[in-house]
Regions:
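Catalytic-site signature of metal-activated, phosphate-bearing donor transferases
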Residues: 62-68, 79, 85-210, 214-217
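A conserved acidic beta->alpha catalytic loop
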Residues: 21, 33-42, 56, 80-83
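Short aromatic/hydrophobic "clamp" motif used to bind/position activated sugar donors
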Residues: 76
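Short, well-formed alpha-helical segments that are part of the catalytic scaffolds
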Residues: 5-25
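Acidic helix N-cap motif at the loop->helix transition within catalytic regions
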Residues: 16, 38-47, 88-89
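Conserved donor nucleotide-binding strand/loop of the catalytic core
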Residues: 27, 42-66, 70
Length: 350
């Protein structure tokens, strides 16, 4: 038996889609509203009678834990209102929750991004399933699931896929949200000045706002405090730091990321950012080798880093070096990627 626990506020545009996709897959729905002024509560009551109000106190973990406390089941699944279940393997979930409760379950979340090359997907594995006897939420913002009483625990992937339908809107149009996140994270850091995760999240917030100098400072603070490479956020911290240095044109400084090679040598996203760093340092041979290595990975977080984005950048390198035929071969391997199609048109090969 498992309960879905959600915290919501002014989510009338998203909540119905989320709940109708999950209602027949779980045993209980618990919804905590933190101050909606729209029809969110009305929509929630169509799907469950366990709808509660929580006075907002600038603490996401407090709201999450309040929702968990009101669940009748020990096993908890957490979703946000702008997430909709795309695939749900009930058999895999049942098998997971019938094991030892001292484990976290990670689900796959697919976000849609948009840049100059068009839309692409960002895939994350995020811990969202836990037993409330052994775990709780911690952190006023970007809250994390943490063990109670320092129990030893495992992290396992559960075969559930969720589409985050609000990601693009969040990133592009959420200046108010970014400002709120900055304020809460800075407040949290004052209380926990040696928490590398908080510096990482503040760095991500500045990165989202394209304030790369402040992003760099906070990513460096996180790394200086020491990051266990087994932490879920460690890889993204290192890769985001790499992209920050590229945006700041600090290409030589970015070569310092080579020291993480041993930990992430088979990760497409890490190899991709390293390839970009080599490319911007005019080390084209190493860059091509890294891009080619990206294509050997079966999985990636950012869509295309193990396929068409790698081929596109190899094509750019060959074109710059005067090897037009090789460039064309790699551009054509990109299929319908718009930037590659543009290069083929300019080379009169389309």
């Amino acid at each position: 038996m498992i309960s879905l626990c959600m915290i919501v506020r002014n989510e009338e545009q998203n909540l119905e889609n989320c709940l109708k996709n999950i209602k027949n897959k779980i045993d209980e729905i618990v919804i905590v509203d933190t101050g909606s002024t729209d029809k969110t509560i009305e929509i929630a009551k169509k799907y469950t009678d366990k709808v509660f109000k929580f006075k907002w106190c600038d603490d996401f973990a407090a709201a999450r834990n309040y929702s968990v406390e009101r669940a009748k089941n020990d096993w908890i699944l957490v979703l946000d209102a702008d997430e909709a279940v795309d695939f749900f393997n009930k058999e895999a979930l049942d098998k997971f929750i019938n094991l030892n409760g001292k484990q976290l379950g990670r689900i796959k979340i697919i976000n849609t991004l948009e840049d100059a090359g068009g839309k692409k997907q960002l895939t994350e594995r995020v811990s969202r399933i836990f037993n409330k006897k052994y775990f709780k939420y911690y952190g006023m913002i970007h809250e994390q699931i943490v063990p109670i009483n320092e129990v030893n625990y495992k992290i396992s992937d559960v075969d559930i896929i969720v589409n985050h339908i609000g990601y693009e809107k969040d990133v592009v149009n959420s200046k108010g949200k970014i400002a709120r996140n900055k304020e809460l994270l800075q407040k949290a850091i004052l209380e926990n000045p040696r928490d590398s995760y908080l510096y990482y999240q503040l760095g991500k917030t500045f990165f989202m706002a394209k304030d790369y100098e402040k992003a760099e400072m906070n990513f460096e603070n996180a790394l200086k405090l020491g990051v266990n490479e087994k932490y879920e956020y460690a890889e993204d911290l290192i890769e985001s730091y790499g992209y920050t240095l590229i945006n700041l044109k600090k290409y030589k400084e970015a070569l310092a990321l080579e020291k993480y090679e041993a930990a992430y040598k088979n990760i497409a996203d890490f190899n991709f950012v390293m390839a970009l760093i080599y490319m911007n340092n005019a080390n084209f041979k190493e860059a091509v080798m890294k891009f080619e290595h990206c294509k050997t990975s079966t999985e990636c977080k950012i869509e295309g880093t193990n396929s068409y984005l790698a081929d596109y950048n190899i094509g750019v390198i060959y074109e710059c070096l005067g090897f037009a035929d090789e460039a064309v071969k790699h551009y054509k391997a990109c299929k319908n990627y718009s930037l590659a199609l543009n290069r083929l048109k300019l080379l009169h090969k389309l």
